[in-house]
Amino acid sequence: MLRPQLNPSSHTTTTSSSSSTQLFASSSCIASLRRPSSSSSSVVAAARRTRGQGSSRVVVVCASSSATASRGDSSSDMAAAAAVRVKAVATIKVTVGELINRSIDIRDLIGRSLSLELVSSELDAKTGKEKATVRSYAHNVDDDDHSVVTYEADFDVPSGFGPIGAIIVTNELRQEMFLEDINLTASDGAGNSTVLPIRCNSWVQPKSVGDEGTPSKRIFFANKTYLPGQTPAGLRSYRKNDLQQKRGDGTGEREADDRVYDYDVYNDLGNPDSNGDLARPVLGGNKQFPYPRRCRTGRPPSKKDPKSETRKGNVYVPRDEEFSPEKEDYFLRKTVGSVLQAAVPAAQSLLLDKLKWNLPFPSFFVIDKLFEDGVELPGVDKLNFLESVVPRLLEHLRDTPAEKILRFETPANIQKDKFAWLRDEEFARETLAGINPYAIELVREFPLKSKLDPAVYGPAESAITADLLEEQMRRVMTVEEAISQKRLFMLDFHDLFLPYVHKIRSLDHTTMYGSRTVFFLTDDGTLQLLAIELTRPASPSQPQWRQVFTPSTDATMSWLWRMAKAHVRAHDAGHHELITHWLRTHCAVEPYIIAANRQLSEMHPIYQLLRPHFRYTMRINARARSALISAGGIIERSFSPQKYSMELSSVAYDKLWRFDTEALPADLVRRGMAEEDPTAEHGLKLAIEDYPFANDGLLIWDAIKTWVQAYVARFYPDADSVAGDEELQAFWTEVRTKGHGDKKDAPWWPKLDSPESLAHTLTTIVWVAAAHHAAVNFGQYDFGGYFPNRPSIARTVMPVEEPVDGAAMERFLDNPDQALRECFPSQVQATVVMAVLDVLSSHSTDEEYLGGEQTRPWNSDAAVQAAYDGFAARLKEIEGVIDGRNKDRKLKNRCGAGILPYQLMKPFSDSGVTGMGIPNSTSI
C-alpha cells in the first residue's frame, strides 16, 4: 500500500531575482515558463486539468520539488524595479448554447464587460492599510474551444506593489457568468515569465443585481493555502469580509443568485395551506422531533401554521451549490425517461381502478413484461396525474419524443438469477452485500429483549425461543454456544417501528409490524435465515399479537414464510431509505457544508480538502424536500410508514445517530460486526470474514485515512496549531451547536485538539459523503428495480394475524400467489419507485470520483500532490483487489452461480446505472 510521507518542516522556496517572479511570490504555484536546465531540479512543471463544472482546460502548474508549507511566508521584499506587465486570462464557461457569446453587447465592444483588480498581499507601509488595487478591463478574445469564452486584460503593476494575493472581479454584463479560472502571467522584459493560477469555479452575478446576498464584487484568492494566523496582512480583511458575505445576516428571503449559507429547521416538508392532511410537524429545534438543520431559504410562513414555511417556487440553495448545466441536462433527461417508463402501468392503473394507487399487478408475468417486452405508451393527456407524483416534469414529458414501446432495463440481480428473490440464501446474503449492509448486527444476548415500556407495548422478551432456533440449526449447537462463537445475527426493526404500528395502520392501504429476523453463520461463511418474528402491539381494542415464522416444507407455512419475508424486506427498505441513506448521508451532511462555507475561508486548507466532497449535495437535498420526502411525495406514497416516514427518521436520529459511530470501524464495532484487534488488518477482526461491504469498505476507509492524515500533517505540525486555528474551531463548534444543535451537549462529539483527532474527524466526513453514500445508493436499481426482491411497502397484514379475517384467509388459501402480490406495492407505487431508483442509481456524465484527476487539490505544494498521487494509485489498486475477490469462489457471499458480484466499493465508473463507483460527494 502506498503511504506517502509528508515532512511539514520543509520550507525550501524557489526564488528569483526578477520582479515578475516576486509579484507572485506569495503563491506556491510559481511556474517559470523558461525551459529549465537539465541540472535544475528546484522547479517541476506539470500539466493538469482545472476543476470546472463539466469542462477541461489544461494549464501549467509548477511546484517546487520541496515546496513551502502554507504556514511559512514565502514573500520577500520587492526589489526596486520598473512597472511589471501582467496579463490576465479569464476563462468563462458557456452554459446555455452560445448565450454568453450572444450577450457580448456594446459593453464588450468598448471593453468594459469584465472588471479585474489585482490585490496585493502586503499592506501599505505608510498608511498601514490595504494597498490600492490595480484595475483593468478584460476584453473578449477568440478561442478555439467553443465550450468557453476567454477574456484578457493587461496590467502595469507598479514597483513596490508586492506579491499578488487575489483578484477582484466585477461582472458588468447583464447576466451571470460561470468563471472557471484566471491565469496571471508576469513578464520582466528580459524573456522571463511566471504564472499565477487562480481557481474560481463560481458564478459571478451582474453588477446590477448586487445586494447583501449577491455582492457586486467577488474576490478570488490565489491558489495558496493559509491558516488564519498566517494570512498575509494585505489579505486579512478580504478574507474576513468574504466569509461575512457568505454568512448573511439571517433575514429576508433568499434569491436564486445569492451565495448565503444559513441554518433552519425542517419546517418545509408539509403544505398545510394546500390541504390540512398535508400538515407535518417541524423536525429540529424541539425535544419531540430532534433533527439536523437544513439551509435557510427565508420563505414566508404558512398562513394556517406559522411554524411551517410556505412551499412556493424552487427551493433556494446558494448559487454555487446548483447543478452544472451538464448535470442538470443529464438529470432531466434521466428523470423524464424514467418517469415515462413508470407512467405506462401507472396510467393504466388509474384508468382501470377508481382507487387509483391501489391496483396490484395481475400476475408475475405482467411484472416481467416491464423488462422483457415493454408496454405501449399512452397519450400524454393520460399522464396528468404525474403532476402530483413528480412535480415539474409534465411539461418535459409533453416536449419529449417518445418511443411507442418503453421498457425498464432489467436489474442486474435479475439478469444473474431471475428467481434469486425467492431464495432464503439471497435474502440473507443481501444483508452483507446488498444496499443496506448497515442494518445487520450481532446477537449478543439471549433471549432477545425490547427496551420499550412493557406496560405499553407488551412483554419485552421475544417469542423467538432457544428451542425453535436450535431446531432450525439442526441441533448442531445450542443457542448459548452460537452466541459465544458469534454465529447468531439479526435484523432488529422491533423497537424502531413498534411505537408507530398503530399510527401507520390507521392509514389506508398500508400496514406495519415490529420485526426481528435471526440468522445463523454456517461453516461455509454464509448466513442461514432461521426465523422471523412479527409483532403488533396491544391497542385499546385488541391485545398484542405476535408470531414467529420459519422456513417450512408445508405448503401453507411456506407461503406464510414468503409473506413474512416480504414484510421484513419492506421494513428494511424503509430503514434503508429513511435512515441509512437519507438521514445519515444526505441530511446529516448538510450542516457540514453550511458550517464550512460560513466559517472556513476558501484559502483555508481544510476548506479546500472538503469542498469536493460537498458537490451537489445541497441541491439534491433541496429537490428531495420538494418531491421525495415532502408531504404527499414519493416516499410517503410508496413506503410503508407513509405520512410518518420523516417522523421515524427523526426518532432514528434521536436514538441512533452519533458522529463518532459514523466512522466505518466504529460503526462495525457498534453493531458487533467487528472487534478491535491490533494484530488484524485494519485493526479490526470481522465477526463474519466474508462480509463484502465491510471488507471492501475498510480498504476505502484506510485509503481515505492515509490521504487525510498526510494532508493534515502538512499544515498542522502539533496540537497547538489545531487548537489555535480560529476558523477551524468555529467550523466545528457551529457543526455541533447549530447544524446538529439538538445534540450539541452529547458527550461523544470529538474535540479538535490534535492533528490526529482532526484527521479522524475529516476522514469520517469524507467517508460518509463519498463511500457510505455510494454503498447505499448506487445499487438501488440493481437490488430494488425488481420490486418483489425489495418491496418498498407491505400493504396487507399476515393472513393468520388474530383476529383472523375468515374471508381473507380463504382467499389466501385459494390463491396465495395473488395474496403475495396484493401485499406488494401497487402498480403505481412499484413503477414510480422503480423509476426513482433508476435515477438515484445513475452516475451523470460529469461525475467526479474519489481520487479522480478532476478533484486533484489546487494547492500545488509538491508534498500534497505526492500524497494525492499515492491516494489515487491506492484506489486503483483497490479496484484490482475487489475484482479479484469477486472471482474467488471461496467467498460465497460475492461469488457463485447467479450471484451478483459486490462492486459498490469500486472507486471508478462510467456514466449510467453501473452498480459501482464512489463519487466524491453525496451525489446522484
Swiss-Prot record:
Residues 239-262, 302-315 have a biased composition (Basic and acidic residues). Pathway: Lipid metabolism; oxylipin biosynthesis. Gene3D superfamilies: 3.10.450.60, Lipoxygenase-1, Domain 2, Lipoxygenase-1, Domain 3, Lipoxygenase-1, Domain 5, PLAT/LH2 domain. It comes from the Eukaryota. Signal peptide: none annotated. Binds 1 Fe cation per subunit. Iron is tightly bound. GO terms for molecular function: linoleate 13S-lipoxygenase activity; metal ion binding; oxidoreductase activity, acting on single donors with incorporation of molecular oxygen, incorporation of two atoms of oxygen; phytoene dehydrogenase activity. Keywords: Chloroplast, Dioxygenase, Fatty acid biosynthesis, Fatty acid metabolism, Iron, Lipid biosynthesis, Lipid metabolism, Metal-binding, Oxidoreductase, Oxylipin biosynthesis, Plastid, Transit peptide. Fe cation binds at H581, H586, H773, N777, I924. Residues 225-924 form the Lipoxygenase domain. GO terms for biological process: fatty acid biosynthetic process; lipid oxidation; oxylipin biosynthetic process; response to other organism; response to wounding. Belongs to the lipoxygenase family. PANTHER family: LIPOXYGENASE (PTHR11771). Plant lipoxygenase may be involved in a number of diverse aspects of plant physiology including growth and development, pest resistance, and senescence or responses to wounding. This is Lipoxygenase 7, chloroplastic. It comes from Oryza sativa subsp. japonica (Rice).
